[in-house]
Amino acid sequence: MLAGMPQRLYACTPTRLASWLDCPRRYRMSYLDRPPPPKGPPWAHNSLGASVHNALAGWWRLPRARRTGPAAGDLLDQGWINQGYASDAQSERYREDARQMVERYTAGLDPATEPLGVERTVGTRTERIAMSGRIDRLDERRAADGTRELAVVDYKTGRRPLTSDDARTSLPLALYALAAGRMFHAICRRVELHHLPSGTVHAWQHSDQGLARQLGRAEDIAAECADADRKFQAGLPPAGVDAVFPPRPGPACGWCDYRAACPEGSAAAAARLPWDGLAGTEP
């Protein structure tokens, strides 16, 4: 880069930054290697999560008069992703569970209240990064004093119980809130995790200072990614690749899509079965 030239912004998503934090080697395989190593089989819990997200997004696109619990269940059935399950019978059991989840969840929503966005892409820029990402749902609400406020809603279908700390510490949710506030010129500090299996909502109200800290954290992570990307693109010997993109072996390696291409990950944890991430799994 020539002296005096503006620094190129690093384009990223919260998912990309999180991938770097989790494991630099997996980050390289996901975003830089071309072609990437072959992935393992699809995960049933990801199929279930995508099916639920798609059904809820479709529900909001229905005419208001048709936004009912059974309609959400029908959308779930129509868009069911039957991948990663041990058998058709197991898939059917979880499809029925998922149908009940979306019917129960949508029964508690006001169909007349239009979200500001559904599966909405938001983005923002700083002096260092150009960040973008997609929000499950962006609500427009009124505070007690009548002030217009926005809230970021993220659907969760995993078996792990959640707390407000999960909402508080989530870097993606904080970045989505900051980006949405800037895009819509409104206050957006509230982030919510809607855990459909338990029917619970776990929320956090950020301060401006808290959002600024999360943005600074994202910029620092992005700087590490950008430096590693440049070194990779310039060409690295095999030893250099591992030095810049080291593995982080641990129990999570059993869930990694690239476990078969990673000796350290393969040694760190046994491969999980594609349906092991489902609640109460038994084929």
What spans do the regions from the language model cover?
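A non-catalytic, helix-rich entry segment at domain boundaries
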Residues: 54-119, 125
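Active-site-adjacent bridging/hinge elements
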Residues: 24-32, 147-154, 226-227
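Glycine- and acidic
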Residues: 36-39, 155-162, 283
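Nuclease catalytic cores
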Residues: 17-37, 41-62, 95, 99, ...
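Metal-dependent nuclease catalytic regions and adjoining charged, substrate-binding loops involved
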Residues: 11, 179-283
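Short beta-strand or tight-loop elements
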Residues: 13, 114-120, 131-136, 249
